[in-house]
């Protein structure tokens, strides 16, 4: 039988075209991107995206704010942070050392109440805090107990809020001598000026003070870690011991502290901190000159500090700063973070807060991620042109600030969040016309994200549409979708508006944007046209299908979860992604996930946007718990109660939403399907909401349409299959019947190369395997079709079968027959189903689990007659299968029916 709609799965890669109905008066130019996915670059940390705030923002009634800006009731700012993907905030700046609005010794030190507000705000937003403590102790306002006061504050934060603490920092920009000057001060060694006649005395005096403060803090918080020195200069101006032959304070400080340990033996310095305002002080730069500079090649490509390229400003290009200040830090084995950064110091109105800033920020983040940076915090110094979060109106009226929202820069951060999680992938760019376009690739074994930024614009007379051919060598594409960042007027970078995913970023709810499903061709590549002043994030999803409590880690290693007869949760994971990696010796062995939770049924496992795994279990007490990896492949956070004890929710399934956040679904004791969702990727959980209108049996499945929206399928009490999908409004469509054959409640789901969802089930009437498919991605449905019984010789496939996907996208079904053997059938290269064939394995329980290894081979798991876990796998992608192997751990189960 030929599978309806399956002809498109016959190739490993796909060609797509995207056209936008904008007036076209610009030339089109070709660009070819070749991505080598066989080798990975740097892994981008999940907390890469950050903002920075002044310590004075922590205080009440500052910058026009009535009360505290950092307050858990400031839901507008919290929602914006979540929607643009911020995971880290740095609180510090010049005001940490008492300098407010240029007035020395004028800023107060935050109280415990101020600290409470900050960290409660951070917890609500799902961000961690780099918390700066005062270091400057000049003679003008000397405090003999300053270090002890810092230690008390650090101890208070550690005791109450360590879960929301990234690390501590001490002081701010100690190398910037002019910031430490004040009336009457000619030479004050306490502020790290160079003492006349003692060359190079500034840095050693700082280092001695920093070490004294750090040791004082560690006497109260032994496990304290630090991000320092917050070097303010990004030229040679403050190099130590002198500008001519010295090195930056960042490099020297890293050399001095790279081997230092805190009180528990861990590295004291978790990251070296550098500041960077690319364009320096804007001086007399006009708005248009600033836009042209921000989008210029010079900032990205030049290797020398220069003036311009337009206007009088001096800029420090990325390659120069990397080579002179930050590459030496990496060579010392220490991560580095840009804890304060922006386009120009103070900003240029109409440029720094215009759409150009969105493209600049996206480019900046990707360039530095590709060069090993651990993260960036764009400074949000209330309320100036470079800010990402601002009030409206700005400046604030006397009644106080309000209506906090994101400027276009936040849209660039959002685009990075959608395409900046995973490993940096090597990319070669063929650009024969030398068009002002940059491109970056980030991915893992499951998803590849290619970001293309077209910075051509009208004012420089180079406006052009880039026709980009993407060649993901070694990456078998299963489906492709597109996310567009635009201001709606290609070529114009000066507008004050932006959209991403055809939506604005709100401050009062979830971002409603969605991915564009692209049409498929068959010539082995992806083609998109990216208009002038537009960025495109292309998501290429590999042909991989997981069914059951199994997921792939960011490094390509599979991880599988089970429960024992006591309800304890266990996991086992591959030692790595390198082939071979499927046999028993290639796995770490079963380890219990402690914490006291006892599961009553199977775990549901999904992957967050930052590539950490998250697991959900229904407990024996009736509530639902979740547990997530703190970092990809890392330790687990511990169990958190998600509520629902009064609803008796069980039979869980989890899926991703369009923005990368997760939703978890389960059947309640009342027979309704219930859902809880993260408020943003990796952040918080909503209350449980009932998807009422149809009673759904356990055995339902959840899939994700190519546009990113989740869709639920389940068998109702009438035996028909019903579906319910996320609507553009953020709600749900309501239940709709897929008429046809009545089905056993245990369904299976898969998505083909062109993005259509397929639903499989066992028919009630003849007990054959049936399937139905979408006619187009996210569209209407074809009629149910009987898969047939060729080769089964009277054997009936039992409910609990799984649908896998070969590396080239062809579906393969594996199920246990009524004879106790495992049978499989697959789509052939001609598009027909092969007929059923035996995989052996007598005594395997009907409910199976399947996933793909990093190289695309399918690996199947089941519970054998001896109650051990058994596995069988393809010996090469799309090839023959191994023999069954006993993975041990007697009594382990994947599903509640196996208990």
Predicted regions and their residues:
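A structural motif
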Residues: 544-899
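Conserved, mostly hydrophobic/aromatic
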Residues: 51, 89, 168, 173, ...
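Aromatic/acidic polysaccharide-binding cleft in carbohydrate-active enzymes
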Residues: 338, 342-439, 443-446
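Acidic, Ser/Thr/Pro-rich beta/coil linker or hinge segments at domain junctions
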Residues: 474-530
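N-terminal substrate-binding region of glycoside hydrolase catalytic domains
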Residues: 32-156, 163, 169-170, 174-175, ...
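N-terminal signal peptide
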Residues: 14-30
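Carbohydrate-binding surface patches
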Residues: 432-477, 482-491, 533-539
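Noncatalytic carbohydrate-binding groove/subsite architecture in carbohydrate-active enzymes
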Residues: 147-154, 199-358, 371
């Amino acid at each position: 039988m030929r599978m309806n709609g399956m002809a498109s799965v016959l190739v490993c890669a796909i060609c797509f075209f995207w056209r936008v109905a904008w007036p076209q008066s610009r030339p089109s130019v070709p660009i070819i991107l070749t991505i080598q996915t066989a080798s990975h670059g740097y892994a981008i940390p999940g907390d890469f995206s950050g903002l920075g705030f002044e310590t004075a923002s922590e205080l009440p009634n500052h910058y026009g704010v009535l009360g505290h800006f950092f307050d858990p009731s400031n839901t507008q700012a919290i929602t914006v942070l979540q929607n643009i993907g911020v995971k880290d905030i740095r609180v510090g700046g010049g005001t940490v050392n008492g300098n407010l609005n240029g007035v020395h010794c004028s800023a107060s030190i935050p109280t415990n109440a101020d600290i409470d507000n900050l960290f409660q705000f951070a917890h609500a937003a799902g961000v961690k805090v780099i918390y700066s403590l005062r270091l400057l102790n000049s003679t003008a306002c000397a405090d003999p107990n300053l270090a002890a006061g810092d230690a008390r504050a650090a101890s208070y934060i550690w005791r109450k809020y360590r879960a929301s603490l990234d690390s501590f920092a001490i002081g701010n920009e100690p190398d910037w001598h002019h910031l430490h000057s004040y009336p009457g001060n000619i030479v004050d060694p306490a502020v790290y000026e160079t003492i006349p006649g003692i060359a190079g005395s500034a840095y050693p005096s700082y280092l001695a003070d920093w070490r004294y403060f750090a040791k004082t803090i560690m006497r109260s918080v032994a496990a304290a870690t630090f991000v320092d020195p917050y070097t303010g200069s990004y030229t040679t101006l403050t190099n130590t011991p002198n500008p001519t032959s010295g090195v930056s304070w960042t490099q020297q400080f890293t050399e001095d502290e790279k081997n230092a340990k805190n009180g528990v033996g861990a590295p004291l310095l978790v990251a070296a901190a550098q500041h960077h305002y690319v364009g320096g002080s804007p001086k007399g730069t006009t708005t248009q000159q600033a836009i042209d500079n921000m989008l210029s090649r010079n900032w990205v490509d030049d290797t020398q500090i220069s003036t311009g390229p337009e206007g009088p400003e001096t800029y420090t290009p990325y390659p120069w700063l990397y080579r002179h200040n930050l590459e030496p830090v990496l060579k010392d084995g220490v991560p580095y973070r840009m804890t304060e950064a922006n386009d120009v110091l103070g900003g240029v109105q109409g440029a720094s807060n215009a759409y150009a800033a969105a493209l600049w920020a996206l480019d900046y983040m990707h360039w530095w991620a590709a060069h090993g940076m651990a993260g960036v915090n764009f400074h949000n110094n209330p309320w100036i042109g470079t800010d990402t979060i601002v009030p409206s109106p700005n400046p604030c009226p006397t009644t106080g600030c309000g209506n906090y929202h994101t400027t276009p820069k936040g849209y660039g951060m959002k685009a990075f969040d959608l395409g900046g999680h995973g490993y940096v992938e090597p990319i070669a760019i063929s650009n024969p016309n030398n068009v002002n376009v940059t491109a970056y690739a980030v991915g893992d074994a499951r998803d590849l994200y290619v970001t293309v930024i077209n910075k051509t614009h009208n004012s420089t007379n180079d406006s052009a549409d880039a026709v980009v051919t993407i060649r993901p060598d070694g990456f078998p594409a299963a489906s492709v979708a597109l996310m567009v960042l635009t201001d709606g007027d290609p070529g114009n970078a000066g507008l004050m508006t932006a959209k991403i995913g055809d939506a604005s970023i709100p401050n009062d709810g979830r971002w409603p944007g969605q991915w564009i499903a692209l049409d498929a061709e068959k010539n082995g590549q992806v083609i998109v046209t990216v208009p002038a002043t537009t960025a495109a994030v292309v998501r290429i999803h590999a042909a991989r299908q997981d069914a059951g409590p199994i997921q792939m880690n960011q490094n390509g290693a599979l991880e599988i979860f089970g429960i024992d007869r006591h309800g304890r949760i266990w996991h086992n994971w591959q030692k790595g992604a390198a082939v071979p990696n499927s046999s028993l010796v290639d796995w770490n062995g079963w380890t219990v996930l402690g914490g006291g939770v006892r599961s009553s049924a199977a775990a549901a496992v999904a992957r967050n946007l930052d590539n950490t795994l998250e697991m959900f279990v229904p407990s024996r007490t009736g509530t639902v718990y979740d547990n997530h990896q703190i970092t990809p492949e890392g330790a687990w956070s511990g169990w958190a109660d998600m509520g629902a004890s009064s609803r008796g929710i069980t039979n869980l399934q989890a899926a991703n939403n369009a923005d990368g956040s997760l939703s978890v679904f389960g059947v309640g004791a009342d027979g309704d399907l219930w859902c809880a969702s993260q408020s943003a990727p990796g952040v918080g959980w909503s209350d449980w909401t009932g998807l009422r209108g149809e009673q759904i049996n356990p055995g339902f499945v959840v899939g994700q349409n190519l546009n990113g929206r989740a869709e639920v399928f389940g068998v109702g009490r009438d035996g028909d299959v019903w579906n319910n999908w996320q609507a553009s409004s953020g709600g749900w469509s309501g239940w709709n019947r897929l008429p046809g054959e009545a089905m056993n409640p245990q369904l299976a789901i898969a998505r083909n190369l062109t993005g259509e969802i397929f639903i499989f089930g066992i028919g009630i009437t003849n007990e054959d395997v049936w399937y139905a498919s979408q006619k187009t991605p996210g569209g209407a449905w074809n009629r149910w079709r009987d898969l047939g019984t060729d080769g089964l010789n009277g054997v009936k496939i039992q409910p609990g079968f799984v649908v896998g996907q070969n590396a080239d996208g062809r579906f393969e079904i594996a199920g246990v027959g009524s004879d106790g053997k495992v049978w499989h059938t697959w789509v052939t290269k001609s598009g027909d189903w092969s007929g059923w064939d035996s995989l052996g394995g007598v005594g395997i329980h009907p409910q199976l689990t399947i996933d793909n290894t990093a190289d695309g081979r399918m690996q199947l798991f089941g519970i054998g007659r001896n109650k051990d876990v058994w596995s069988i796998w393809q010996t090469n992608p799309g090839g023959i299968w191994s023999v069954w192997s006993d993975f041990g751990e007697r009594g382990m189960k994947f599903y509640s029916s196996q208990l």
